[in-house]
């Protein structure tokens, strides 16, 4: 967005859920561009959020902040309430106050939960979340829909599918595996490697978001012919859109791509599937393509190699 002339206000709470220095380095890299302004406070601080938004007057808001992680939500559910529910509520209040042109909010593929139908389509049911994290993101979708209906806030929810790549979260499998393998330590492989994920390279995710900024959900009275399979609400300017590669990769193939990129064969601890996890995620990206003309397409081998190149530079390996 900075490359195309946008002025970007980046807000990060700098929580210690993972390495704060990594977040700080991200902000420092972005601050090299004069179009970027860095802010630091928590989203549950409504007063600071409102003050900052009144000052900067954003016309588009992209809400990517959340307490992430399926497993962590079992042990620390309160942090998910504070960040994902209260924080998102504050975002909605600010969007209402400002009358933004478009509010875009991150959801997750985990909202599909126990849904047996594959690939996951945006109009599939999301009634059975299997983790508290997924439940909070499902609640975000419902909260945003109600505000879109009540206050005519054009809103797009992104459902992300296993994002990976440079600057990724250290609690994600790719980061953890690389760190362990370079240290000569074994890696924990859940569900004995039989997990399947729709791995989505971060660069593709960003491109999908960038294109969706200009695809503003219309008000119910301002619509042309419906798009087949659209998730557009009948009563609100609100829709959900999957951003995923549209293919499933077995965890063992993902690990092999990392082994090839690092030139190391991992020692593997085969483990049972963790509580709250789902065995398969698979995105339908038909709606994304219809709306934007774009679908993620970076092969796992290429994306993992880019991550390894970044990791070696960032951590001097």
List where the protein language model places each region.
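Short aromatic-enriched loop/helix-cap "lid" or pocket-rim segments at secondary-structure transitions
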Residues: 20-24, 116-118, 168-171, 202-203, ...
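N-terminal Rossmann-like NAD(P)+-binding domain of SDR-like oxidoreductases, especially those catalyzing
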Residues: 1-163, 212-213, 280, 294, ...
